[in-house]
Design a protein with these regions (language model features):
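Intracellular juxtamembrane helix-capping segments at the cytosolic ends
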Residues: 4-17, 197-212
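Loop-to-transmembrane helix entry/capping segments in MFS-fold secondary transporters
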Residues: 19-29, 126, 211-223
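C-terminal membrane-cytosol helix-exit motif in multi-pass small-molecule transporters
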Residues: 44-45, 59-79, 261-269
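A membrane-interface helix-boundary motif in multi-pass transporters
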Residues: 45-61, 240-258
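Helix-to-loop junctions at the C-terminal end of transmembrane segments
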Residues: 48, 143-155, 242-243
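Structural signature of the two symmetry-related core transmembrane helices
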Residues: 59, 158-173, 252-255
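Intrinsic disorder in cytosolic terminal tails and internal cytosolic loops
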Residues: 77-87, 268-324
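Pair of pore-lining "gating" transmembrane helices in MFS-fold secondary transporters
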Residues: 90-111, 190, 194
């Protein structure tokens, strides 16, 4: 249901945006989406985590949010399915983007699926668990822009590797702190979130460096699917790890995922020359929970409706010196 809501909302935003306002619209969407995610985590602090109250509250809030749309006199947008690009094709275009987004989906799912369980297991109370889960989201809001600026100035693969290493170190240090060092634990979570969430946008931006505007939305569909596939695996893997290896394995697994992303980025740097800075597209922050439709809010992207014939020049491998 929520996936459908994201698609509808993003289609509406895309329909009402112009080329001059798409960047602003995506920025506002990013801030509202991440802000809502952070506030939602704080609801754990109410102490109602063992009842259905929070689920009921979420249902009520979603229902209330629909009311202004129903009362609006504005017509519904013309929904069209975007052209898709296969995962196999994406692996040929940008292996790092595909692998990075898949592992990133696993890590995010682990954090939000079992993070609260970890917090309670190390002795945090409900209020502290709320802060523990909110810190990564606000870390993402704080560090998203600086990370994006760095990726526009340097080889994006180097930035992906650096961000993954920093996130891995922060996650590793988090295992050393508990209730008695709660402030230090929050700092680690803030830094970890500031590296985890920007990786999503970094990988998409890296893939876009090899694509034309008409290919970006098609590629986003496949990349979102890869990230979603990783997210499906994350929570069960974290649960199995905690059950068989103990609660201490939670951040060990997350650190391992960050290390894999960094190692693969380093490997890819040895396999393909960097895209020159002047040929790179700008970094565009995209919410982790968005659908492929959000890619259309990127001012550089161009929509290709499903079924429309793709010209030869729209093939990522057509006259592209950076794909090999």
């Amino acid at each position: 249901c929520f996936a459908g809501m994201y698609i509808v909302c993003e289609s509406w935003l895309n329909d009402k945006s112009t080329n001059e306002t798409r960047g602003q619209m995506l920025s506002l969407y990013m801030i509202i989406s991440m802000g809502g995610l952070g506030i939602g985590q704080m609801m754990i602090s109410t102490g109602a985590e063992n009842s259905m109250a929070l689920f009921i509250l979420a249902s009520v809030l979603v229902s209330i949010a629909v009311v202004p749309v129903l009362l609006s006199a504005t017509g519904a947008p013309n929904f069209e399915e975007p052209e898709r690009m296969s995962v196999r094709r994406l692996l040929q275009v940008s292996p790092l983007a595909v692998i990075g987004l898949g592992l990133n989906g696993v890590a995010v799912s682990m954090l939000f699926g079992m993070g609260a369980v970890y917090g309670l297991s190390i002795g945090l109370d409900s209020s502290e668990v709320g802060y523990f889960m909110t810190a990564p989201v606000f870390g993402a809001l704080i560090l998203q822009y600086p990370v994006g600026r760095l990726s526009d100035r340097f080889d994006r693969r180097m930035v992906i590797m650096g961000v993954a290493v920093v996130g891995g170190i922060a996650a590793g240090l988090a295992t050393l702190f508990g209730k008695g060092e709660f402030a230090l634990l929050l700092v680690c979570m803030l830094i970890y979130g500031g590296s985890l969430f920007p990786l999503y946008s970094l990988c998409i931006a890296h893939a876009n460096d090899f694509l034309t505007p008409r290919q970006m939305v098609a590629a986003a569909s496949g990349l979102v699917m890869v990230n979603g596939g990783g997210a499906v695996l994350g929570s069960p893997l974290a649960a199995l790890s905690i059950e068989f290896l103990g609660i201490g394995s939670f951040f060990v697994m997350i650190t391992g995922l960050q290390a894999l992303i960094a190692a693969f980025a380093l490997y890819r740097m040895s396999q393909r020359a960097a895209v020159p800075n002047e040929a790179q597209g700008p970094f565009v922050a995209i919410p982790e929970s968005s659908s492929a439709i959000a890619a259309t809010l990127n001012p550089e992207a161009e929509w290709i409706p499903s079924g429309e014939e793709i010209a030869a020049e729209d093939d990522p491998f057509h006259d592209n010196p950076y794909v090999n």
